[in-house]
Amino acid sequence: MDKKECGFSIDDFLYAVEGGNTISKWWPHRLNLKILQQNNPDLVPFDKNFNYREEFSKLDYFELKEDIRRIMRESQEWWPADYGHYGPLFIRMAWHSAGTYRIIDGKGGANGGNQRFAPVNSWPDNVNLDRARRLLWPVKKKYGNKISWADLMILAGNVALEDMGFKTIGFGGGREDIWEPEIDTYWGPETEWLADMRHSEEGKIKGPLAAVQMGLIYVNPEGPNGEPDVLGAAKDIKESFGKMGMSIEETVALIAGGHTFGKCHGAADPSKYLGPEPEAAPIEQQGLGWKNSYGTGKGKDTITSGLEGAWTPTPIKWDNSFLRILFKYEWNLQKSPAGAWQWVAVNPDREDLVPDAHIPGKYHPPIMLTTDLALKLDPELSEVSKRFLEDPEYFRDAFAKAWFKLTHRDLGPKWRYLGPEVPEEDFIWQDPIPEINYQLIDQDDIKNLKEKILKSDATVTELVYTAWSAASTFRKSDRRGGVNGGRIALEPQISWEVNKTHVPKVLKILNEIKEDFNKQSSDKKVSLADLIVLAGCAAVEEAIKRAGFDIQVPFRPGRNDTTQELTDIKSFSFLEPVADGFRNYIKPECDIPEEYLLIDKADQLNLTVPQMCVLVGGLRVLGANYDSTDYGVFTDNVGTLSNDFFVNLLDMSIVWKPVRVNNRDIFEGYDRKTGDLVYRGTRVDLIFGSNSELRAQAEFYAQDDNREKFIRDFVEAWDKVMNLDIT
């Protein structure tokens, strides 16, 4: 043989690029437990004791800002800056990092810095933002672990605004980087860029999605599906920004404020001249995508969206010119050199001509996008736009607040914000909780309060159910929810269907205990929020004693109660669970397999697979089911913390048969010999015996030598959930 062969074919190594998904190809609907194993510590290169909050505190924050400012003003030959300033590019980078947030599930957003990873790094709406991050690399290299990419991208947007004359209201750090793509975020059903399969027959975006097409951050700037329909674009804007959690005023402020800066890039047809996106680019491009073969491929020949031109004659200066020009002129529909629909001013005055970004002395008429004209022609959007036009200071303030909300929405409660520029003002979207101005309870108080709680009319089941109901509203995606604030006693949570079981009774008892304790003359007080957790912990300890073990359940005080006035009812309504497999609850109208929803819930609670297993098994034997059903209560000793759920689920003397009850899959377990009905369970219950990976966990915890191990693991997982919102 003249040609040497290695003895293998490429097919032998496809696992290296398919991510181990060969099993899922055989069984595409099997549970994906990898969702609960993201950012495995073995993947993260930091030392095990690394603490980002501590590292950030060592940062010379204002020196960092100065370095970012210097980078923005130093145009690089490999990617020349428009108008000699990278500010508009950095604003777009920050905006597109934060703008993926959607309020329904809290996913997307700037936290984690997922713009660096697939699929977001390769979306058509993010063309050339890889260059923005490369421009920032010298800064990231210099400051290292003290500043995450997630924080740096947002801070760069802030510095850009400030360097172009805008006064922001501040910045909060604290976003920690992820180290792999997020596989728990649903970006849509489409398999092609800019495809649209996400709208219902009524034209609404289905599910939690906020963007109108695959690969966009929010709306299509050319109009719905690329058609220059201004009023259709207005409808898209309101829905898309609304699902990002923005009001109409905030929406107009963000569009008008953002388009005060920079330009669009469409020197030629992107489908003809742009190479593959970063994830598909050849190895020698080192992660840079969209290589441009038109002309020089940069500067005046840049291709990004395919739209071409700038909005104002002052594209690197904050002013009111975007709105002034929008309302001053009539607009002609034209196509850009790249073939994209846009609007050009009719007979613009000389002083309103836009300077070329790279050729001195050359000028162009200002342009508007279809979505921009929506701010003028849609009555609701136009009313706000005119108010901003007439009152530039009001506009400035509205944009400053909307920008801060956009870039901080998924960072969580204000106590998580880091740095010297955190604004003092509280905003309703931060879910504010008053600061504690009293002395916290001590160990003696905790002991006495536990005794009072356990002597009350509330049962172990009721106390556990209520504590779980409050704590399990937490979602890691945007750090909202949880016990802190005591919002389970406020609207909308107190009226949720799932909270009608046990919760009102327990809250009444705990409020009486709270009022009695707080009558004492000292400065010491206890909040309802702390009492809810303490009651749950006391109940779990009692259940452990009944099992014959003496194991302490940790409790740390420090939660406070908030008010109805500080609670945005509409915003909090999105935290109502469609399903909570831990309480064996699902809304009747939901037809998604319950085990899928269990995995999503466990992911939002930041649980590992073993933690999810012990919590389900433990909550079942404690009887903590919605509506007090017996589903999954595989024990004769309800209220005793034991591994009975797993033992009896795996008992081969029981045979399971499916039935439909109230439009729900229920399974009845019969004694193989007698034919007697023994237990009933849901899909969530039986999945622990059906799924091979979960069965392995169930077998482990069902072992005779792991009875105490099960209890200790339950306590650890319980403690984790109770404290998710304060750690």
From Swiss-Prot:
Family label: Belongs to the peroxidase family. Peroxidase/catalase subfamily.
Protein name: Catalase-peroxidase
Gene3D superfamilies referenced in this protein's UniProt entry, alphabetically: 1.10.520.10, Peroxidase, domain 2 (1.10.420.10)
Crosslinked positions (Tryptophyl-tyrosyl-methioninium (Tyr-Met) (with W-95)): 218-244
Keywords: Heme, Hydrogen peroxide, Iron, Metal-binding, Oxidoreductase, Peroxidase
One BP term from GO: hydrogen peroxide catabolic process
Residues at the active site: 96
Annotated catalysed reactions: H2O2 + AH2 = A + 2 H2O; 2 H2O2 = O2 + 2 H2O
The encoding gene: katG
Record-listed heme b binding positions: 259
Top class in the EC scheme: oxidoreductase
Cofactor(s) the protein needs: heme b
